[in-house]
Swiss-Prot record:
GO terms for cellular component: nucleus. Residues 16-25, 298-307 have a biased composition (Low complexity). The lineage of its organism: Eukaryota, Metazoa, Chordata, Craniata, Vertebrata. A zinc finger (C2H2-type) spans 342-366, 372-396, 402-424. It is found in: Nucleus. Keywords: DNA-binding, Metal-binding, Nucleus, Repeat, Transcription, Transcription regulation, Zinc, Zinc-finger. Belongs to the Sp1 C2H2-type zinc-finger protein family. PROSITE patterns: ZINC_FINGER_C2H2_1, ZINC_FINGER_C2H2_2. Transcription factor which plays a key role in limb development. Positively regulates FGF8 expression in the apical ectodermal ridge (AER) and contributes to limb outgrowth in embryos. Residues 287-297, 426-445 have a biased composition (Gly residues). SMART domains: ZnF_C2H2. A motif (9aaTAD) lies at residues 194-202. It comes from Gallus gallus (Chicken). This is Transcription factor Sp8. It holds the Pfam family zf-C2H2.
């Protein structure tokens, strides 16, 4: 009865199932299953094989007993649905799931060979024989290996035939290097089927020790120059940087540092030659300077005794008119050098200083240069001399470094202290610790009226409002 139902439903008439309507669209990307000429009994056996496997999916669980008519009807309906979906007995050219030809007998069902995964674990294999005993063998118990695992290799081979390898490289091939530590030498050179993890031409071509690059089109690189660099994580970089070991410091210029004109790119970086410092011992860097950087022998420059005498005379060189005159006179100008006077060269100035640093600071007044900047918040004042900057910083900090030895008054500037001390030693001075006021005699006015010497010793500076004493409780803003 089940075979008759399968033959009736598997007729070439159009099926009402939705899956059969779209079965032709499923079969476009697959090789069509070319069905051999078989009798209606083979078709019935094929459908019976599918029907016997349906209880494994729970379609009709009562079909194992074979006694209930309702179970038989349900199994027949399910077999009809599956046979209609898989084109069991239908049009032989549009099987959507026939991936590979089974290579078995012509009467055997393709579902029994390739898709016997539909078998129930308890059934003995109604689709294995293929002929007509699919429904009767449903009650037999036999040990059966999982068929899905056994069919993996056949399915993969069929998929390789259906989907040939595309010409474009896999997106992971660009970063997957042949020098990966996880790869063995045998795996890279194996002649198996090409897979996505095969090493292709990436951003670094594997090079052999003699510098020959591997072919970019080959998927399996040659094992000759590759196996030597497999066990090193930086094997692909060996030939690129093999010439950098001693070429930059060798006798000849290396090829990678030569410009197209043939000039070495490091010719501008000359070493310090020993001729500039005749009193010092020749350094090994200067001795090897020609061969290391310049490409030729280092020629020592002869320095004039005049410049060496100026450089190592024990003092800094000076270009003031007095020093230039002493150099012009030679030995006769020893008296000028002994005086050590440095005059300003600006016409009409005529100031003379005993130190060259003082002369340089004086020349900044003429040029207007003020290199010393106050870094106090929102100040930014610039000064010509560093001592002026230090004096200015005390106005921000409120520091009074200089104290009077008589009255213990403190001052920010040393010249203010010296003026204050003169008031104690003067004829009209108070002379006592509390006599801070000026005397009526000559020299009674002391120093500057605007500086801090008139203030008490512990008074806060004007720039520190947080140090001001709190107002008295009985006064408010100076008013009673």
């Amino acid at each position: 009865m089940l075979a008759a139902t399968c033959n009736k439903i598997g007729s070439p008439s159009p099926s009402p199932s939705a899956l059969s309507d779209s079965a032709s669209s499923f079969g476009k990307g697959f090789h069509p299953w070319k069905r051999s000429s078989s009798s209606s009994s083979a078709s019935a056996g094929s459908c019976g094989a599918v029907g016997s496997g349906l209880p494994g999916f729970g379609v009709a669980g009562a079909a194992r007993n074979g006694s209930s008519a309702a179970a038989a009807a349900a199994a027949a309906a399910a077999a009809a649905l599956v046979s209609d979906s898989f084109s069991c007995g239908g049009s032989p050219g549009s099987s959507a799931f026939s991936l590979t030809s089974s290579g078995a007998a012509a009467a055997s069902s393709p579902f029994a060979n390739d898709y016997s995964v539909f078998q129930a674990p308890g059934s003995a294999g109604g689709g294995g024989g293929g002929g007509g005993g699919g429904g009767g063998a449903a009650g037999q118990e036999a040990a059966h290996q999982p068929v899905f695992i056994s069919k993996v290799h056949a399915s993969v081979e069929g998929l390789q035939g259906i989907y040939p390898r595309v010409g474009m490289a896999h997106p992971y091939e660009s970063w997957f290097k042949p020098s990966h530590p996880g790869l063995a030498a045998g795996e890279v050179g194996s002649a198996g089927a090409s897979s996505w993890w095969d090493v292709g031409a990436g951003w670094i071509d594997v090079q052999s020790p003699n510098g020959a690059a591997a072919l970019p089109g080959s998927l399996h690189p040659a094992a000759g120059g590759l196996q030597s660099s497999l066990h090193s994580p930086l094997g692909g970089y060996n030939s690129d940087y093999s010439g950098l070991g001693h070429s930059a410091f060798g006798g000849g210029a290396s090829s990678h540092l030569l410009s197209p004109a043939g000039q070495h790119l490091m010719d501008g970086f000359k070493p310090v030659l020993p001729g500039s410092y005749p009193d010092s011992a020749p350094s090994p860097l200067a001795g090897a300077g020609g061969s290391m950087l310049g490409g030729g022998p280092a020629a020592p420059l002869s320095a004039s005794p005049r410049s060496s005498a100026r450089r190592y005379s024990g003092r800094a060189t000076c270009d003031c008119p007095n020093c230039q005159e002493a150099e012009r006179l030679g030995p006769a100008g020893a008296s000028l050098r002994r005086k050590g006077l440095h005059s300003c060269h600006i016409p009409g100035c005529g100031k003379v200083y005993g130190k060259t640093s003082h002369l340089k600071a004086h020349l900044r007044w003429h040029t207007g240069e003020r290199p010393f900047v106050c870094n106090w918040l929102f100040c930014g004042k610039r000064f010509t001399r560093s001592d002026e900057l230090q004096r200015h910083l005390r106005t921000h900090t409120g520091e009074k470094r200089f104290a009077c030895p008589v009255c213990n008054k403190r001052f920010m500037r040393s010249d203010h202290l010296s003026k204050h001390v003169k008031t104690h030693s003067g004829p009209g001075g108070a002379g006592g610790p509390g006599g801070g006021g000026p005397g009526p005699g000559p020299g009674g006015k002391k120093g500057s009226d605007t500086d801090s010497e008139h203030s008490a010793a512990g008074s806060p500076p004007c720039h520190s409002p947080e140090l001001l004493p709190p107002p008295e409780p009985g006064h408010r803003n100076g008013l009673e």
